[in-house]
Amino acid sequence: MDWTWKNPLPEEGRKISFVGKGGSAKSTTLAHLVRYWKAMGIPAVAHDADDSDGPEEPGSLLAWAEMLPVHSDGLGAPVYRAPAAPSLRAEMDRLRPPHGLSLVDTKAWDRGKHNSHLAAIRASDLLVLALYPSGMEKWRGASILGAMDEVESMSGHRPRVVCLLTRFKKGVGAAGEVRKELENEGLYVLKAEIPANESKTGYSQSFGTVPRLKANSDMHELAKELLVEATR
């Protein structure tokens, strides 16, 4: 298959951060996305800001990249340990490829002033909020909007935010109900969704492997949709 996709990104590229609670599939989703963007001809770099296990331990995205064979092209994009929060925006700008993406994988959502989340909001053009479709997620959406209000009041910058529903069982009504609740709150929910897949070849079991590409899969559709959203 010809994976080529007309690159819609401007010369200065775009910066996208992924946020959400622990276990919301941020790292898994991002690992697969960079593989798809590589196949589609979209250059990218990723910054792992997940220091949940301590600043000396690699976050899951960086650990994943380091597990892959050296003779392979890895995840399809270089993965770097993110710098301290005050330097995040400058580093994202410095490493962002022309007409490409500079991506951040954050740790579990926490709006504390000394972690990477407020820095990721300040640095990004687009914020992807990964949400498991449960009743609590409406509250999490309100929390991140509150953090964005805080960043905007301090810096005048407010990135576009989109919600991504993840890790749910297809055919269960909860995802649709949460989608409606979020939309009623004025949040934009991506059409693409990433359901739970516990099979041997599914997303949930793919850590440490080279993500597989499948045309028109959930992840492929998400890769295309995010490119459109990044240029709005």
Task: Place the predicted regions along the sequence by residue.
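N-terminal beta-loop-helix "entrance" segment that forms/cooperates
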Residues: 55-80
